[in-house]
Amino acid sequence: MEPLEHAGLGICPADAIDRAKQASNMILQKEGGQGCLWELVQILKDYNSQELPVNYFYQRLEEHENIFKKMATDRKVTDTVMEVAEDICEMFERNGQLFLCGNGGSAADAQHIATEFVSRFYKERPAMNAEALTVNTSTLTAIGNDYSYERVFARQLEAKARKGDMLIAISTSGTSKNVLEALRYARKQGIRTVMLMGDHEVPELQEICDHVVKVPSKITPRIQEAHIFIGHTIAEYVEHKLFGEKL
């Protein structure tokens, strides 16, 4: 059993460990069996260490799965997401507007989530008033040039948002300067604030956010995958609660 112990039982499928042990014992009883088994172990070890595309894909799937399992068992995450969804329902019932912002992939998420409200998710229903602050290139470049890039979202809120509206800010790190500036402005104006982020510590967020949703990961693409899942879940819930029984 020495060669098998050296390689580790991980070379066998989880449901085949007993058979692997039996087979290795049979091989070891034969003349030259230990050398044969040792060679097989080396082949398996070399194969498992190769960066094959399929192995790479499975590794990323496993990362994704582990993060979602953590979210599913973290009551702080699940409760906060549903609190955000309830706040959005109440805000729309008061004829408020939902704003979203972010940079790069988070900007794309902001636009995606806003569209789920304006167009539809599953049901035919009236459009809901949501807007991503990332789409007007003339506005973005003018504010960035005339003021600073830090103000590209806050300045738009100054023009469009009113007390009782909501802002969902998206930043995997939680430290994007223009996102934080938008949250600060919104907080001062009585606009409810939400941050979607990764597993990072940003103390200021406790002062400027009504809700902080932390995905339990520091890996940017995995965080973004979770953010769009959260956005979809919120959009589906809001649509069902406001229109599911009426239409």
Predicted regions and their residues:
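Glycine-rich, charge-decorated loop segments at or immediately adjacent to ligand/cofactor-binding or catalytic sites
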Residues: L196-K214
